[in-house]
C-alpha cells in the first residue's frame, strides 16, 4: 500500500481525540478519514483536528461507504465486541485500545472469529511495549547479560481517582497493563494471581479498599509483585525493578530537571499517563500504520495476548476475596505464533 492509510477512529472521547490528533499530526503514512461517534458534539469537536474526515454514528455505515482502510477503536471496553465483529468481517486491520473485551468469554469469541481470516488483524493497545525504557529492559532480559531474571517489582501509582472508580477497576483498568507487559518482559505467561491488602489509605473513597499488592507467578518461576495505588497524591508513577542473578535494573525513574535548594532536593514527576507514555503512544501508532502498509497488519500485542490478559484480570478480581487464583489457558494457537 503506497497511498496514505485511511483510518477510521471509533469513539471521539478523550482517548479517541488524542489518537485523532496523533495520526493527523505526528504519524506518517496515515490520516483520519472517518470519525465514528454517536455524540454529535464530540464528533464535531474531534473533527476540528481531522479536516475532510467523514462523520458516522456506526462502524457498519463507515464500512458500507468504503470510507476506511483500517479502524482504531477507542470506545469503552464494553462496546469493543460490537465494533470488532463487523470490522473483522470486513477484513479490516484493527488497533483496539485495551482491553480487547471486558471478559475472557467475549475475548475468546473474537479470537475464534479472527482465525477465520488469513492472518491476525487485531493489535491491542497495550502501549507500554513501545516505551523505550521497557524495550531496553526486555533486551537486557533476553541478552542474559545480567544472568537469569529472578523477580520483578512494579509500581503503578495515580495521584487520585474519581468516585466512579470501583474496586474491580484496580485490576481491570489499571493492573491490566501489568498483566500484558510483565509476561512480555519475562517471556512467560501468568499462571496465578494473589491480592494482598496493606493498610487502607484514608484518601480512598467509600467502597474502595486500596492500595493493593498484586502477586503474580509466571510459568517460568519468576515472581512478580505490583503495588497498585490510586491516591498517592504527588503524581503519576509507573516503574519496574528487575532482579537478576548478577544485578538489578530499574526503569520509570523520575526525569527532567532536578533542583537542590534550602536543604531540599526537588524533582519533577508526571501527573498522568499522557506525558509518561507520550513516546510509547506515538511509536505504537506509527508501528501499527507501518505494519498495515507492509501487509503484516500487527506490530504489537495481538488478540490472543488480549485474551490472556482477560483471563488474568478475571483471576485478579477473584483474588480480592483471598487465595491464590490460577490462570488456566490453552496453548497459544499456531495462528498467533
Curated annotation (Swiss-Prot):
One Pfam family here: GFO_IDH_MocA
Bridged cysteine pairs (disulfide): none
Catalytic activity: myo-inositol + NAD(+) = scyllo-inosose + NADH + H(+)
Gene Ontology process terms (BP): inositol catabolic process
Molecular-function GO terms, alphabetical: inositol 2-dehydrogenase (NAD+) activity; nucleotide binding
Protein keywords: NAD, Oxidoreductase
Enzyme class at the top of the EC tree: oxidoreductase
Protein name listed in UniProt: Inositol 2-dehydrogenase
Organism: Corynebacterium glutamicum (strain R)
Amino acid at each position: 500500500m503506497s497511498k496514505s492509510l485511511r483510518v477510521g477512529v471509533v469513539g471521539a472521547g478523550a482517548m479517541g481525540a488524542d489518537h485523532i490528533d496523533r495520526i493527523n499530526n505526528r504519524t506518517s503514512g496515515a490520516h483520519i478519514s472517518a470519525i465514528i461517534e454517536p455524540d454529535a458534539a464530540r464528533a464535531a469537536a474531534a473533527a476540528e483536528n481531522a479536516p475532510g474526515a467523514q462523520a458516522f454514528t456506526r462502524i457498519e455505515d463507515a464500512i458500507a461507504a468504503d470510507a476506511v482502510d483500517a479502524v482504531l477503536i477507542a470506545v469503552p471496553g464494553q462496546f469493543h465486541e460490537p465494533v470488532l465483529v463487523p470490522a473483522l468481517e470486513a477484513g479490516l486491520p484493527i488497533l483496539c485500545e485495551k482491553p480487547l473485551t471486558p471478559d475472557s468469554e467475549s475475548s475468546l469469541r473474537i479470537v475464534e472469529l479472527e482465525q477465520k481470516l488469513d492472518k491476525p488483524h487485531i493489535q491491542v493497545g497495550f502501549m507500554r511495549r513501545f516505551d523505550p525504557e521497557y524495550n531496553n529492559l526486555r533486551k537486557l532480559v533476553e541478552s542474559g547479560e545480567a544472568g537469569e531474571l529472578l523477580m520483578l517489582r512494579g509500581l503503578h501509582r495515580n495521584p487520585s481517582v474519581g468516585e466512579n472508580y470501583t474496586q474491580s477497576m484496580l485490576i481491570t483498568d489499571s493492573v491490566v497493563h501489568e498483566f500484558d507487559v510483565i509476561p512480555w518482559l519475562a517471556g512467560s505467561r501468568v499462571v496465578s494471581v494473589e491480592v494482598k491488602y496493606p493498610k487502607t489509605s484514608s484518601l480512598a473513597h467509600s467502597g474502595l479498599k486500596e492500595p493493593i499488592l498484586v502477586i503474580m507467578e509466571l510459568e517460568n518461576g519468576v515472581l512478580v509483585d505490583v503495588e497498585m495505588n490510586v491516591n498517592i497524591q504527588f503524581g503519576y508513577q509507573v516503574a519496574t525493578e528487575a532482579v537478576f542473578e548478577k544485578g538489578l535494573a530499574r526503569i520509570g525513574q523520575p526525569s527532567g530537571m532536578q533542583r537542590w535548594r534550602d536543604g531540599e532536593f526537588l524533582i519533577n514527576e508526571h501527573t498522568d499517563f499522557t506525558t509518561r507514555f507520550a513516546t510509547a503512544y506515538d511509536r505504537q501508532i506509527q508501528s501499527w500504520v507501518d505494519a498495515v502498509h507492509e501487509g503484516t497488519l500487527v506490530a504489537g500485542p495481538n488478540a490472543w495476548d488480549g485474551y490472556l490478559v482477560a483471563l488474568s484480570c478475571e483471576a485478579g478480581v477473584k483474588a480480592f476475596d483471598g487465595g491464590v487464583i490460577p490462570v488456566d489457558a490453552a496453548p497459544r494457537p499456531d495462528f498467533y505464533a
